[in-house]
């Protein structure tokens, strides 16, 4: 019998060029320490027994799929349909990856809350793609759409610059170790945001001038060594995206009295924001009702 398999993919945070990354803007993206693991155990029983566990180890999804067409006898729900689509796309790219095997137990384990928007879908796509030995960018585009930056993060453990050039992903490893990291915090907004819906509802597209401005800001984010300079870049970036999507920056609507700067990450209105301010910022956000406030290097790997 074949050896059991183990896979892991990193979560993601998009620091710059949200929305515009889909139209070729350079984006600074950070893989997170937290991700999703997947264990594949070969079994004699026919079919695929799928178990998904949340960050606490509790089963939040379970189903059985036929191995030839991934049909499920249970009542189809959104998660069943998503897993089926991922497996179907993988099998089309590599029809042999399940051949000569009777059955499997597939067990996934999230390292973060599935409500956080850190990439429960992209990490799953990348793990299945590793199992099937296929291109995860193809599966992501086929099943979910989007720019693919989250797939690039899933494969990495270091910061990247991500860009679509003629719809092909370009991924560049970069150094991003802010000397002022003790002043950086990721704050969960208590709302899971749907990136695809947000793009459809708000994003109007981007001009060459706006794209060039975002590209320049992304490069400056990497170079800056002072918190005050970083804050100025955050504000400039917020203003550009605000004009692109017709929504006010989050600091104006929720954190106007914060002694620092707050920037949206990814789709505006939910998931995480980035705060650059006092070292005791956790107390401020907790008082505002945002209990999840994570210091930068508790979520992002330190570079070697």
Predicted regions and their residues:
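C-terminal nucleotide
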Residues: 2-10, 14, 21, 30, ...
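Segments that form or flank anion-binding pockets
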Residues: 27
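DPxDG-like acidic metal-binding loop motif
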Residues: 115-137
């Amino acid at each position: 019998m074949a050896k059991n398999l183990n896979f892991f993919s990193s979560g993601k945070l998009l620091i710059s060029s949200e929305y515009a990354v889909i139209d070729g803007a350079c984006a600074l993206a950070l893989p997170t320490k937290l991700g999703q693991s997947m264990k594949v155990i070969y079994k004699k029983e026919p079919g695929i027994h799928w178990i998904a566990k949340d960050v606490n180890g509790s089963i939040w999804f379970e189903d059985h799929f036929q191995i030839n067409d991934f049909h499920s006898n249970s009542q189809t729900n959104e998660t069943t349909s998503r897993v089926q689509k991922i497996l179907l796309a993988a099998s089309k790219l590599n029809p042999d990856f399940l051949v000569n095997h009777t059955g499997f137990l597939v067990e996934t384990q999230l390292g973060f809350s599935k409500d956080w928007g850190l990439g429960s879908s992209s990490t799953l796509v990348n793990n299945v793609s590793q199992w099937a030995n296929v291109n995860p960018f193809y599966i992501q585009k086929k099943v979910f759409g989007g720019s693919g930056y989250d797939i690039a993060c899933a494969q990495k453990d270091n910061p990247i610059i991500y860009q679509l050039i003629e719809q092909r992903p370009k991924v560049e490893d970069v150094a991003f170790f802010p000397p002022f990291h003790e002043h950086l915090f990721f704050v969960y907004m208590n709302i899971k945001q749907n990136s695809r819906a947000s793009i459809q509802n708000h994003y109007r597209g981007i001009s060459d001038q706006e794209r060039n401005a975002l590209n320049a800001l992304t490069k400056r984010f990497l170079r800056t060594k002072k918190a005050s300079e970083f804050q100025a870049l955050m504000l400039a970036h917020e203003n550009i995206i605000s004009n692109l999507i017709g929504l006010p920056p989050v600091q104006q609507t929720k954190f106007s009295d914060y002694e620092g700067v707050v920037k949206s990450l990814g789709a505006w209105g939910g998931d995480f924001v980035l705060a650059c301010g006092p070292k005791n910022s956790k107390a401020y956000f907790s008082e505002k009702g945002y209990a999840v406030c994570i210091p930068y290097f508790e979520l992002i790997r330190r570079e070697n």
